[in-house]
């Protein structure tokens, strides 16, 4: 999820461009294997930037996907302030199509291949808590000031809206905007938090540098901050005990290959720092943080995070896999379940 924080402008960040979450790398282990997960990249806009149509002064951005250009994004917004009374939130947006026993977003169906049902919402909640714990209680790493707090914050691909809601509590005088394809955010939110149904994936797959990074740069005023946090899905191992031909590595490699075939690349976190610098951002900081999976870590905090991340992975196995593997390789449900069963037995193992 991406977020942009405007510290001077009084206008909401409607239609603001989004970037990918970058900055922390997390490792997940079953036995002694790990995944590179959340990666955070902080970026500051240079002085003398041209102001975009929806330019913001001091901004920090966070996302789980990417953003489309501000001009097109504004026209596609469906505001979600009151689920019961909002005339703009049509029944078609809330009637989620079902496939493989899971539900998916209805607005611009097919833009995003992961589900949005209760299991997925639970996974997103666990993921958010893991990110926060691995970052030692922080929601962001950009140097935002509570003495000179931001005026506007944009959270792109907000999911269940937990990050946006917490930011609304931290910065009560800021306007917090969260966008997502699915209206699955709660009703009870701080008065300064607003959610919109919007497609941030438009344009992000074909050319991230020009369609996302450059537009995000143009949308920020001098001094603006953008933060992206990415989860890498390549399994790593500290003690070389991970079988490169085993079920976990095979599952991950198949997902990466499927994503590439469908032109939705899963691996680009390692390229973000160079891309952001190339489009003009300065003070670009990349932080890589290891995320354990299950209970192998000796440190009590990391052990707790590891078990939570294992739950997150187990909740996500089918959601990550069905659309990608079926659409890319025409695999049947039975074939996918056989693969997931083998990976499941390793991800949840204890040391």
How does the language model describe each region?
Residues 212-225:
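A short glycine-rich, Lys/Arg-flanked "PGG" loop and its adjoining helix->strand segment in the class I
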Residues 103-104, 109-112, 158-163, 181-184, ...:
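Conserved beta-strand elements of beta-rich interaction domains across eukaryotes
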Residues 123-126, 130, 162, 166, ...:
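Acidic, Ser/Thr-rich intrinsically disordered and amphipathic helical segments
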Residues 200-211, 338-351:
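Short, intrinsically disordered, charge-balanced linker/junction segments flanking boundaries
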Residues 146-207:
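Class I SAM-dependent methyltransferase SAM/SAH-binding core
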Residues 2-122:
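N-terminal auxiliary segments of SAM/dcSAM-dependent transferases
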Residues 225-319:
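Conserved catalytic/acceptor-binding region of the Class I
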Residues 118-152, 162, 166:
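Conserved alpha-helix/loop element of class I SAM-dependent methyltransferases that forms part
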């Amino acid at each position: 999820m991406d977020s942009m924080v405007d510290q001077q402008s009084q206008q909401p960040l409607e239609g603001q461009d989004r970037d990918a979450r970058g900055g922390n790398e997390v490792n997940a282990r079953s036995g002694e294997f790990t995944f590179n997960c959340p990666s955070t990249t902080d970026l500051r806009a240079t002085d003398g930037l041209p102001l975009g149509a929806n330019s913001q002064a001091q901004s920090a951005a966070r996302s789980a996907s990417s953003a489309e250009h501000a001009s097109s994004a504004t026209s596609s917004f469906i505001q979600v302030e009151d689920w019961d009374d909002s005339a703009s939130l049509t029944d078609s947006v809330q009637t989620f199509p079902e496939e493989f026993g899971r539900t998916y977003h209805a607005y611009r169906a097919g833009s995003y291949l992961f589900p949005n049902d209760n299991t997925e919402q639970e996974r997103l909640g666990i993921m958010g808590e893991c990110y926060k714990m691995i970052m030692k209680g922080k929601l962001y790493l950009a140097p935002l000031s509570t003495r000179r707090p931001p005026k506007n914050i944009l959270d792109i691909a907000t999911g269940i809206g937990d990050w946006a809601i917490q930011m609304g509590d931290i910065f009560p005088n800021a306007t917090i905007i969260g966008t997502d394809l699915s209206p699955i955010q709660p009703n009870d939110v701080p008065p300064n938090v607003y959610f919109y149904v919007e497609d941030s994936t438009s344009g992000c797959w074909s050319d991230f540098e020009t369609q996302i990074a450059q537009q995000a740069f143009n949308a920020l005023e001098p001094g603006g901050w953008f933060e992206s946090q990415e989860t890498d899905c390549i399994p790593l191992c500290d003690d070389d005990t991970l079988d490169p031909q085993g079920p976990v590595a095979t599952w991950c490699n198949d997902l990466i290959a499927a994503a590439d075939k469908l032109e939705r690349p899963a691996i680009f976190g390692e390229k973000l720092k160079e891309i952001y610098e190339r489009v003009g951002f300065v003070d670009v900081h990349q932080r890589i943080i290891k995320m354990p999976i299950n209970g192998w870590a000796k440190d009590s905090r990391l052990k707790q995070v590891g078990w939570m991340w294992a739950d997150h992975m187990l909740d996500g196995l089918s959601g990550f896999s069905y659309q990608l593997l079926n659409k890319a390789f025409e695999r049947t449900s039975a074939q996918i379940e056989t693969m997931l069963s083998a990976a499941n037995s390793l991800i949840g193992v204890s040391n």
